[in-house]
């Protein structure tokens, strides 16, 4: 599933194709996953923003917003393909949403209403914004259960999925099964989250071996070339040379260097 770096890369690259453009209409698969799109036909896009893994489309002279979730394999393209699910007609051309596994969702809501949606209501702060405060994170981490599922819950901070949780934990030297982090651990993890996500956004996200994520211009992301743990099972840890191990935690494949990331607490 696209995580914060992939969604932010998508937002930045499609913004010039949509901002300032008037929506002339949509063509989309008959599906409950695309809701009330007709309500924004005729409106002009003012701004694309992001909340966690969601893209938010605002409009001029309207209180409506379009909420887009990419799902497992969703993405925008400049040209259609066999997996195109939504075609957006604008006054300057078309934009295409592709989604091979059909888990993406689009929904038009009243402005601000997205914050009350079940999947968005309990979201934590944005990791690359001013609302992600060290002291708040340290205090929450001191009470947290198993750290990786805690990160994936989106409550302490938004946008981390399997890839960037593994990478952040490796960089901070924290075992994914650790819990109730010390202040020193939490400070390292806080810094690692910001560093990993910043680098991943700058690299255009991660394109894995299945190739499901591509940037809107058709190029892959490149951060997978910098992965230190994720997807490196049995390969040497770039830090110490010990083999990266993979195990399952909370139903998620988890990658760890047990030398660099010793389990400190039962």
Residue ranges and their predicted role:
Residues 1, 79, 124-126, 215, ...:
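Intrinsic-disorder/low-complexity coil detector
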Residues 3-6, 10, 19, 80, ...:
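Alpha-helical structural motif
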Residues 22-37, 43, 49, 54-56, ...:
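Basic, nucleic-acid-binding surfaces and adjacent catalytic neighborhoods in DNA/RNA-processing proteins
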Residues 59-174, 183:
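Phosphate/anion-contacting hairpin/loop surfaces
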């Amino acid at each position: 599933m696209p995580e914060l770096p992939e969604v932010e890369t998508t937002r930045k690259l499609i913004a010039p194709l949509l901002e300032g453009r008037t929506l002339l209409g949509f063509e989309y698969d008959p599906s409950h996953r695309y809701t009330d799109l007709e309500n924004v036909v005729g409106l002009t896009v003012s701004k694309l923003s992001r909340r966690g893994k969601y893209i938010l489309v605002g409009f001029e002279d309207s209180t409506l917003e379009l909420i887009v979730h990419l799902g497992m394999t969703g993405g925008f393209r400049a040209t259609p393909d066999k997996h195109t699910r939504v075609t957006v007609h604008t006054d300057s051309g078309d934009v295409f949403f592709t989604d091979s596994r059909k888990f993406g969702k689009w929904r038009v809501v009243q402005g601000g209403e997205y914050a009350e949606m079940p999947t968005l209501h309990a979201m934590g702060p944005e990791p690359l914004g001013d609302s992600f405060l060290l002291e708040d994170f340290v205090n929450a981490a001191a009470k947290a259960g198993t750290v990786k599922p805690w990160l994936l819950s989106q409550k302490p901070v938004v946008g981390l999925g399997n890839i960037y949780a593994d990478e952040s934990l490796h960089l901070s030297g924290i075992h994914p099964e650790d819990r109730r982090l010390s202040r020193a651990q939490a400070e390292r993890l806080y810094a690692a989250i910001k560093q990993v996500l910043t680098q991943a956004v700058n690299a255009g996200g991660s394109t894995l071996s299945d190739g499901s994520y591509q940037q809107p211009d058709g190029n892959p992301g490149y951060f997978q070339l910098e992965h230190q743990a994720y997807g490196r099972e049995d390969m040497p840890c770039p830090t110490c040379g010990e083999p990266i191990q993979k195990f399952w935690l909370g139903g998620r494949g988890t990658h760890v260097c047990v030398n660099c990331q010793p389990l400190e607490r039962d």
